Design a protein with these regions (language model features):
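The feature captures the beta-strand-to-loop junction immediately N-terminal to the Walker
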Residues: 23-25
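Helix-to-loop junction immediately C-terminal to a conserved catalytic motif
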Residues: 37-39
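ABC-fold ATPase nucleotide-binding domain signature/coupling loops
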Residues: 43, 102-131, 140, 146-149, ...
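Conserved "ABC signature" C-loop
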Residues: 73-115, 140, 156-157, 212-215
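C-terminal portion of ABC ATPase nucleotide-binding domains
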Residues: 163, 167-170, 185-228
């Protein structure tokens, strides 16, 4: 109320196992779109997850339907294992393997019992992202929002983690927000955002309909432009 729309006409449907890629021009609101699914911003229209209108649910029910992981994740001052399990008795090794972090953890002096966070071993950006993603997969929800989850990963690691992500989320819908586009041909759908407008379709359809997307994709082909 009293403000202007950040974007409009966002329309798409997704089935379990779908990964939806979201990207756009600078400051287009793609991260805001991710947080709309957390109801952190008001919206007009309808957002339904498993038949539930998100705006009508209490926080507990929303938390049971939607998971969110940002590009700068928070780690707890606890062990690697506890950061993943969060009190559950899950097989943490398989989730560390899924995010290609198991070998690095095994090389730590105390393995999965290594303390991380502000009071423990200082992890690199890529390590922290992968540990947080392992936690997200361990406690996956029907809808998972990933906001630039691979921004600190090299190309080869990102490719492998993405391949594993597809296997682990066959019973979920994933919305993956990113400015790195070389994996977007593998997305089930792509949403391009620019000047408050959105266009949804397959990668090939967006390449044909949105010249700026095609320019960015071709510039980044091979993943070299954003590799760290």
């Amino acid at each position: 109320p009293g403000g202007s729309d950040i974007f409009e006409n966002v329309t798409f449907e997704a089935e379990k196992g779908n990964i939806i890629g979201v990207t756009g021009s600078v400051a287009c609101g793609k991260s805001t779109l991710g947080k709309v699914f957390l109801c952190e911003y008001p919206y007009e229209g309808s957002i339904k997850v498993e038949g539930n209108e998100l705006a009508e649910l209490d926080d507990t029910k929303k938390a049971g339907l939607v998971g969110y992981l940002g590009h700068d994740p928070e780690l707890f001052n606890d062990t690697v294992k506890n950061n993943i399990q969060l009190g559950d008795n899950a097989d943490t090794t398989k989730f560390l393997k899924a995010v290609c972090f198991d070998e690095e953890v095994n090389e730590m002096e105390n393995g999965q019992e290594t303390l991380v966070g502000n009071t423990g071993v200082r992890l690199s950006g890529g390590q922290a992202q992968r540990l947080a993603l392992a936690r997200t997969l361990c406690h996956k929800k029907p809808l998972i929002i990933l906001d630039d989850p691979f921004s600190a990963l090299d190309k080869d690691t990102e490719k492998q983690v993405f391949a594993n992500l597809k296997e682990y989320t066959k019973d979920c819908v994933v919305i993956l927000i990113s400015h790195r586009l070389y994996l977007f041909p593998e997305m089930d759908k792509v949403i391009w955002m620019e000047n408050g407008k959105t266009v949804a379709g397959t990668h090939d359809e967006i390449m044909n309909r949105c010249p700026q997307y095609a320019v960015l994709y071709n510039e980044q082909r091979g993943g070299a432009s954003d590799e760290e």
